[in-house]
Design a protein with these regions (language model features):
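Pre-Walker A (Motif I) flank of P-loop NTPase domains
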Residues: 36-41, 73
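Helical hairpin unit composed of two closely spaced alpha helices linked by a short loop
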Residues: 76, 172-214
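Hydrophobic positions on the alpha1 helix immediately C-terminal to the Walker A/P-loop
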Residues: 54-58
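Conserved glycine(s) of the Walker
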Residues: 50
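The Walker A (P-loop) glycine that initiates the GxxxxGKT/S ATP-binding motif of P-loop NTPases
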Residues: 44-45
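Cytosolic-facing regulatory segments adjacent to core modules
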Residues: 8, 12, 23, 30, ...
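C-terminal regions of RecA-like/P-loop NTPase motor modules
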Residues: 2, 101-103, 130-133, 150, ...
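Core recognition of P-loop NTPase motor domains used across DNA-transaction enzymes
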Residues: 1-38, 133-136, 294, 359
Length: 364
């Protein structure tokens, strides 16, 4: 049975059906193969660094735009930090930027800025986006209430029963999906906000959530995306004194189970917050808080300890890969995301390779 299953996967791959979905970050895609079926990914960073934003941009928005109408993408998003409306507003902000070339933050869309009301013109744009949002709603299901391991498992089982059939074969529970091409992304944002139940500690609850996700990944080919906080403790201070500023796998907070269970671990690092003037040749004084280092710390299927320099525009939760530092001649242009819209006018040489700041980091 295993041999037949392996042959099926090889044949399936020869048809191009094992390819991952686009993430909007080509170099990162090349390293981790994009958003793929049956892959457990952990994303972590300190608070306010952009971990939820990269999840929304690279794991949801970009695949959505590629597979809005083909029925091959589904998202179950357990949002423990923001409401479903806020999450959709962030996706809308990205869409408006790409389609209308206008930067509208979620605060502006919701008229939450003091003395600010969304203009009639921009309100009309929002209404023009409603058909797109309705399509998104068919793909992205958001649960924004409290979550425990048991409630998560129950909700996911109900969703999976709609998408396929469970059966028993030779004492094994088998799941047969209605659509073999479907990538079902399951997002936990973020894990430390899980609700403790049945006398379990927070760590035990988090570990059980991760264990359930592994079970459903193996049986039903879901793709878990777990978001966690980083814990920069006293040992991290010692590392910074030695010039080792980026995150490590053991910087995850509250539990190490997701790091062990996952195939891919990605960290987001903000050198500006650490008061660095430069990082891997990038001028942080010029880029400021618009620069992020996206690091693949673990990759069960390929290369790890690889850094990718990215521009990040928090107003619209948007990421874009930067050229190599030696190819940047005008840092000022990266202070806003307009350069992304028309790369033909870029005054730097954009190279399509995956060697962007690929230097070994942990030389302890």
């Amino acid at each position: 049975m295993i041999t037949n299953s392996l042959l099926h996967q090889i044949t399936y791959g020869r048809e191009g059906k094992n390819w991952g979905f686009s993430m909007g970050l080509p170099k990162l895609e090349e390293i981790i193969d994009g958003v793929t079926q049956s892959t457990y990914t952990l994303v972590f960073s300190p608070t306010g660094t952009g971990k939820s934003s990269i999840a929304l941009y690279s794991y949801i928005y970009k695949p959505l735009m590629e597979h809005l109408d083909d029925g091959n993408f589904k998202v179950t998003y357990f949002s423990l930090e923001m409401s479903a409306e806020m999450l959709y507003a962030k996706l809308l902000s990205m869409y408006i930027f790409e389609k209308y070339h206008i930067e509208l933050s979620t605060k502006e869309l919701l008229s939450r800025k003091k003395d600010y009301i969304l203009s009639d013109e921009n309100y009309e744009i929002v209404k023009q986006c409603l058909p797109w949002l309705h399509k998104v709603e068919e793909i992205v299901t958001v649960y924004d209430k409290s979550l425990s391991a048991d409630s998560m498992y129950s909700l996911l089982m109900k969703e999976l029963e709609k998408e396929g059939t469970f059966s028993e074969t030779e004492g094994r529970k088998i799941y047969t999906p209605n659509n073999e091409n479907l990538i079902h992304l399951v997002v936990i944002d973020h894990l430390s906000l899980a609700r403790r139940t049945n006398g379990r500690t927070l760590k035990e609850e988090m570990d059980l959530i991760s264990s359930y996700l592994v079970t459903l990944r193996n049986r039903c080919k879901i793709s878990p995306l777990v978001i966690m906080q980083a814990n920069r403790n006293s040992t991290a201070m010692d590392r910074r004194k030695e010039g080792l500023n980026n995150l490590r796998i053991d910087d995850t907070k509250d539990t190490g189970a997701p790091a062990q269970d996952s195939e891919i671990i990605i960290s987001i690092f903000n050198p500006h917050r650490e008061k660095l003037s430069s990082y891997r040749g990038y001028d942080i004084k010029s880029l400021g808080s618009n620069f992020r280092v996206v690091t693949v710390l673990k990759n069960r299927y390929g290369e790890a300890d690889v850094e990718v320099g990215c521009a990040f525009y928090g107003k619209i939760s948007y990421f874009a890969e930067l050229p190599k530092p030696e190819d940047i001649y005008d840092y000022e242009k990266y202070n806003n995301p307009d350069w992304i819209l028309d790369k033909k006018e870029d005054n730097v040489k954009m190279e399509d390779d995956v060697t962007n700041i690929r230097k070994p980091k942990f030389t302890l």
